């Protein structure tokens, strides 16, 4: 869902290059060691962070890790940035960037977890290549993930979930966890689950939340 443009968000993004990379050049290497206090910590990245409830909550809960939130919309990125600055979340960096270039922004084998939360389902067949679980995106995740790293995916869209199961399976990924109704599962996955804004809204309406965890072999 595209948010209404908020001029203050664009201004905030421009004023804080130390906290957010705004449309970075994919051809230029990013010095992540300078952007984090300790880049040797485990690294998690969320692609499509929205207003940032998930990534900011997770970063505050896990100071022993580093986090990167990637969001294409400037207004949404500005909202996350405002939270980061107000709450002094030092282990979180942001990117206002196209996820199609993610493998050019991060070193190979540097990421422990890739989070995909409530991604745009792009339901029309002609838009299949835009889905974040399409094979070309899986190629990129494989490049940046460590050998022991994994992907975590949540959605309320049954069609996208079914498509993603097939896409990951055809790619040769192995599933560590699959749920057709995450919020009614009784396990440690639910216990450590952090909700997104959309997830809270959809679950409150009684909609099932689909979830999978998978890794590359």
Curated annotation (Swiss-Prot):
EC class name: transferase
Catalyzed reactions per annotation: guanosine(46) in tRNA + S-adenosyl-L-methionine = N(7)-methylguanosine(46) in tRNA + S-adenosyl-L-homocysteine
Positions of the catalytic residues: 120
EC numbers, comma separated: 2.1.1.33
GO molecular function: tRNA (guanine(46)-N7)-methyltransferase activity
A GO CC annotation given for this chain: tRNA methyltransferase complex
Biological pathway: tRNA modification; N(7)-methylguanine-tRNA biosynthesis
Chain residue ranges for the region called Interaction with RNA: 126-131
Alphabetized Gene3D superfamilies for the sequence: Vaccinia Virus protein VP39
InterPro entries, per database record: SAM-dependent_MTases_sf, tRNA_(Gua-N-7)_MeTrfase_Trmb, tRNA_methyltr_TrmB_bact
Keyword tags: Methyltransferase, S-adenosyl-L-methionine, Transferase, tRNA processing
Pfam families (alphabetical): Methyltransf_4 (PF02390)
Positions of S-adenosyl-L-methionine binding: 46, 71, 98, 120
Residues noted as binding substrate in the record, renumbered to the chain: 124, 156, 196-199
Function in brief: Catalyzes the formation of N(7)-methylguanine at position 46 (m7G46) in tRNA.
Family designation: Belongs to the class I-like SAM-binding methyltransferase superfamily. TrmB family.
The protein, known as: tRNA (guanine-N(7)-)-methyltransferase
Lineage: Bacteria, Bacillati, Bacillota, Bacilli, Lactobacillales
Gene that specifies this protein: trmB
């Amino acid at each position: 869902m595209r948010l209404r443009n908020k001029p203050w968000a664009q201004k905030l993004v421009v004023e804080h290059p130390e906290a957010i990379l705004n449309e970075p050049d994919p051809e230029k290497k990013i010095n992540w060691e300078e952007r984090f206090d300790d880049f040797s910590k485990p690294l998690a990245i969320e692609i499509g962070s929205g207003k940032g409830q998930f990534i900011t909550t997770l970063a505050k809960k896990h100071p022993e890790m580093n986090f990167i939130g990637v969001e294409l919309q400037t207004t949404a990125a500005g909202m996350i940035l405002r939270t980061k600055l107000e709450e002094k979340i030092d282990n979180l960096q942001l990117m206002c960037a196209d996820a199609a270039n993610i493998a050019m922004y991060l070193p190979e084998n540097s990421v422990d977890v890739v989070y995909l939360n409530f991604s745009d389902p792009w339901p029309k067949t002609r838009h299949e290549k835009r889905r974040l679980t399409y094979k070309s995106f899986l190629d990129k995740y494989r490049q940046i993930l460590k050998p022991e790293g994994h992907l975590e995916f949540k959605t309320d869209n049954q069609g996208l979930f079914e498509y993603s199961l097939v896409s990951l399976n055809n790619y040769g990924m192995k599933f560590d966890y699959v749920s057709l109704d995450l919020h009614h599962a009784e396990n440690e996955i639910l216990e450590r689950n952090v909700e997104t804004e959309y997830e809270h809204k959809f679950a409150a309406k009684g909609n099932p939340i689909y979830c999978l965890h998978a890794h590359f072999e």
